[in-house]
A protein has these predicted regions:
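Active-site nucleophile and cofactor-binding loops and adjacent substrate-binding regions
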Residues: 96-103, 121-126, 144-158, 203-205, ...
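Hydrophobic alpha-helical hairpins/lids featuring a short glycine-rich hinge
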Residues: 83, 87-140
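Terminal-appendage/accessory-domain detector
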Residues: 1-100, 200-210, 217-455
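Secretory-pathway/luminal and periplasmic proteins that interact with or process carbohydrate-rich
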Residues: 59-62, 132-141, 186-194, 305-307
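Amphipathic alpha-helical interface segments
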Residues: 101-105, 147-168, 178-247
């Protein structure tokens, strides 16, 4: 009997770059653009610096570049640093309740450089990496992973990135299955960083990226992994005691996850996005000033409440950048004052601003009964806003800018890239990097891109 891992491996090993539709290739390039943008913006964050210092100390062969720097190291260690950097500001994509780009794209870029892979094949690795991660996340319901304390980004992402790494190494279906089995031994990461804003939140995608390359290379060397790693008696499906075979296999090879990506407009937890867009739009349309806000109530799913509304004392008065990014009260308050919730709004020197904290105290997040059975990825919220002059507004917000049903345009993606990349590299290199990514499928190798974003 064919196992779930074997089904994925057979498909992934046989992906033909030339057979991918232009729309799929374009979607993958958008994912690369966003991941590189986030990595460059996050390159100087303290948690990235710490991971980089440890990686440098390993004394590994210099085969892959660290984004935004002149450093080179082994592909696994470069993926560790770059994955941490992509996720350093919580500004990276978030499809299927997983930050897939932070795990898959550092692997594709690192191995693409180290193995001198043609860019079209690297793009195909991105496509299949997103697919494998998404299908596993959907099959076991990533929302249940959150509720049980697991971090879906690293738990599921290591499999997609391992499939991408195996593909770039040219492994056959049987060996790719072993790579997935080995990746299952590395599938880990938990949500306890929510308790005190610990840096491990940023690290876990990078660790999954590192481990995925190791899994593929161990399989390449002949190490075996369980073929039933997903659906076996002790497999990954047991993490949530659920499986959705229909979602796991539906449209394999015709429906592509890179075309269903949730791109972030705000440098804040994705669970905050509908309310952020809704409140900012409402304030603009009704000409409401921050000082006129009497109270805001936001009803969300139970799992969303646990991430962005609790514990209330931390969400109202965040102590770290991560505390603030995971806080709906803080995110809404700073956005109402500044008109946006970008990187600067979550800087440490903003966290004690009495104007922000005063507004945050007027924002209440609760579990809405109508969302009790909402599935992962459903970030619908109910918004009630009362003003000091007696006005009351009620809205049901189902989507946000960057959602697949309201996607950011290429121009918006480009603007985000330029804002982020300019924090690390000069303007002419920003333009060169952008041009290289948008034309990635036409390049002979990765050198034009790497020249712009490293060194």
């Amino acid at each position: 009997m064919t196992t779930a891992a074997e089904s994925l491996a057979t498909w992934a090993a046989g992906v033909d770059p030339a057979a991918l539709a232009p729309s799929v290739v374009h979607a993958a390039k958008r994912c690369v653009l966003d991941a590189v943008a986030c990595a460059l913006a996050g390159a100087d964050m303290p948690w990235v610096e710490r991971v980089l210092a440890v990686a440098r100390a390993q004394g590994s062969p210099s085969r892959a570049s660290v984004l935004g720097r002149a450093s080179r190291m082994s592909a696994p260690l470069a993926a560790l640093v770059n994955g941490t950097a992509v996720h350093a500001l919580d500004y990276d994509d978030d499809p299927a309740a997983c930050h897939i780009g932070a795990v898959v794209i550092p692997v594709a870029l690192g191995l693409g450089q180290a193995l001198r892979i043609a860019p079209p094949r690297m793009i195909a690795a991105v496509v299949l990496g997103y697919d494998v991660t998404t299908r596993i996340g959907e099959a076991i319901d990533a929302d249940l992973l959150y509720q049980k304390g697991y971090h879906p980004t690293s738990v599921c992402g290591v499999f997609g990135a391992a499939a991408a790494a195996a593909y770039l190494h040219g492994l056959d279906a049987a060996t790719t299955t072993h790579a997935l089995g080995i990746a299952g031994s590395f599938s880990s990461g938990n949500m306890e960083f929510l308790a005190d804003g610990a840096m491990t939140k940023r690290l876990q995608p990078g660790k999954a990226a590192h481990d995925s390359i190791l899994a593929a290379e161990l399989a390449h060397a002949g190490l075996t992994g369980p073929r039933s790693i997903l659906d076996g008696r002790y497999g990954v499906w047991r993490y949530t005691e659920t499986r959705d075979d229909a979602r796991f296999t539906h449209g394999l090879g015709t429906r592509f996850a890179v075309q269903e990506v949730y791109v972030k407009k705000h440098a804040s937890c994705l669970g905050n996005a509908p309310a952020l867009d809704g409140v900012l739009d409402l304030m603009h349309a009704q000409r409401i000033a921050p000082a006129q806000i009497r109270e805001i109530r936001v009803g969300v799913r139970v799992s969303t409440l646990a991430m962005v509304g609790e514990p209330r004392e931390i969400r109202e008065r965040p102590q770290t950048m991560l505390d603030a990014q995971m806080s709906l009260p803080y995110s809404l308050a700073v956005a109402m004052l500044d008109g946006e919730a970008g990187i600067a709004q979550f800087a440490p020197d903003r966290l004690g601003d009495p104007r922000i904290l005063g507004l945050a105290e007027r924002i209440h997040v609760y579990a809405h009964p109508d969302l009790a059975t909402a599935k992962a990825g459903n970030l619908t919220c109910y918004l009630d806003l009362d003003t000091t002059d007696g006005r009351h507004f009620t809205e049901r917000l189902e989507t946000y800018r960057g959602h697949p049903r309201s996607p950011m345009t290429d121009e918006e993606m480009e603007a985000k890239f330029r804002r982020c990349a300019s924090l690390r590299i000069a303007a002419e290199r920003v333009s060169a990097a952008s041009e290289a990514i948008w034309n990635l499928d036409k390049l002979a190798d990765l050198s034009p891109l790497l020249a712009a974003i490293t060194g």
